[in-house]
């Protein structure tokens, strides 16, 4: 069993399949977990951030349901912590029509059976004194959580290794090996590796693997983030507006983000990106104006044409996709691992996934049922 890509998605799938006693080889083009997973802020928010994301909500809710067990298992197998905390989010609305925007969000979340409560600005400021005077309305989202993605990746890779996953660094995959209509392995820069099944979880690099663009037309979307330290501001929970978010870490740092940029594979931090983030941050929490800016970085999210992930079997037997998670890779890791394990082991998952099929981008609309035959 080969997993192509060692980020949070690939590592989670590898661990899940290793638990089922499969021999799993995890291949990464460089060091596992050093791309989008390393750069993420670590917010676990199942609510839709745009109309395009509505089909994702059931999947996100299921992943949130799985998260406590997922974290407990990873931490137990690795002996390491992940920084997971369900501290909730205060969502603030600063526009003149903020109350109307807040009420629309509350109605939408309630219709989707997501926990949310409209709160007054006084209640919001009592909970988080750093909130600025621009706040016109607020909502409390008690079920949302955060973790430290870098700690999670360290724990995941350790857990996978302890379960027998063979982790190969600096192993970029160039193409699939096909025997008729059956994927029988991969071609790396150095060698050929045979396998009964291959799962591609290579994020924004998936489309660059020869022949996979028709299933995984991913593209990089740059996100820049900052880390702040403040002696006068301490947050107990995530603060979020339409312009910025602030995520507290257990080490006292505050992660601020982020940008959404179509900048190709350019991963550097820019003055314009930093300014955009800081403008939103200082409107959200003006007291952070005197904070120390201790770090800045950028990552490449795997975008797709419809902003939805690409999950499941292709029309090539033994070839599966688990990519294109865009801004939701950390959030969707547990449910993605469960779904891919079901496909590989049983042929069919127990969850509606038509929205996410790799075949939605191809001209051929034939079913992938035969191609999804489980490992024998």
Where do the language-model regions lie?
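Short beta-strand to alpha-helix junction loop
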Residues: 58-61, 92-101, 139-158, 268-273, ...
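C-terminal catalytic lobe of FAD-dependent flavoproteins
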Residues: 149, 285-376
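Active-site substrate-recognition segment that forms the wall
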Residues: 12-20, 29, 42-44, 48, ...
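Beta1/beta-strand and adjacent pyrophosphate-binding region of the FAD-binding site
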Residues: 1-9, 25
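Residue-level detector of alpha-helix initiation sites
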Residues: 7-8, 31, 327
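Helical element adjacent to the flavin cofactor pocket in flavoenzyme catalytic cores
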Residues: 139-197
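Dinucleotide-binding Rossmann-like beta1-alpha1 core, especially the glycine-rich loop
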Residues: 42-127, 280-282
């Amino acid at each position: 069993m080969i997993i192509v890509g060692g980020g949070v998605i690939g590592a989670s799938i590898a661990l899940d399949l290793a638990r089922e006693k499969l021999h799993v080889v995890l291949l990464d083009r460089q060091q596992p977990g050093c791309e989008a997973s390393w750069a993420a802020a670590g917010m676990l928010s199942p609510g839709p951030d745009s109309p395009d994301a509505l089909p994702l909500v059931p999947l996100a809710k299921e992943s949130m349901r799985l998260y406590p067990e997922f974290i407990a298992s990873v931490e137990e197998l690795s002996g390491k912590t992940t920084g997971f905390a369900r501290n909730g989010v205060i969502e603030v609305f600063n526009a003149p029509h903020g109350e109307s925007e807040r009420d629309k969000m509350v109605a939408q979340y309630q219709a989707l059976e997501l926990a949310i409560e409209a709160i007054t600005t006084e209640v919001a400021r009592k909970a988080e004194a750093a909130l600025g005077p621009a706040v016109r309305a607020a909502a409390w989202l008690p079920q949302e959580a955060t973790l430290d993605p870098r700690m999670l990746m360290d724990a995941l890779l350790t857990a996978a290794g302890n379960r027998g996953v063979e982790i190969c660094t600096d192993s970029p995959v160039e193409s699939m090996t096909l025997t008729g209509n059956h994927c029988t392995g991969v071609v790396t820069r150095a060698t050929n590796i045979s396998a009964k099944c291959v799962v591609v979880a290579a994020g924004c690099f998936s489309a660059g693997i020869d022949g996979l663009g028709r299933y995984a037309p991913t593209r990089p979307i740059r996100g820049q983030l900052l880390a702040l330290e403040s002696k006068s501001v301490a947050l107990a929970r995530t603060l979020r507006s339409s312009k910025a978010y602030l995520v507290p870490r257990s080490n006292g740092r505050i992660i601020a983000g982020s940008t959404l940029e179509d900048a190709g594979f350019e991963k550097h931090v820019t003055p314009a990106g930093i300014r955009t983030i800081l403008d939103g941050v200082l409107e959200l929490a003006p007291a952070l104006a005197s904070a120390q800016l201790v770090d800045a970085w950028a990552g490449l999210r795997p975008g797709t044409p419809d902003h939805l992930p690409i999950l499941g079997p292709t029309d090539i037997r033994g070839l599966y996709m688990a990519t294109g998670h865009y801004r939701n890779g950390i959030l969707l890791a547990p449910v993605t691992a469960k779904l891919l394990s079901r496909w590989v082991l049983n042929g069919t998952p127990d969850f509606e996934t038509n929205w996410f099929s790799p075949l939605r981008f191809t001209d051929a609309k034939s079913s992938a049922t035969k191609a999804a035959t489980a490992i024998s």
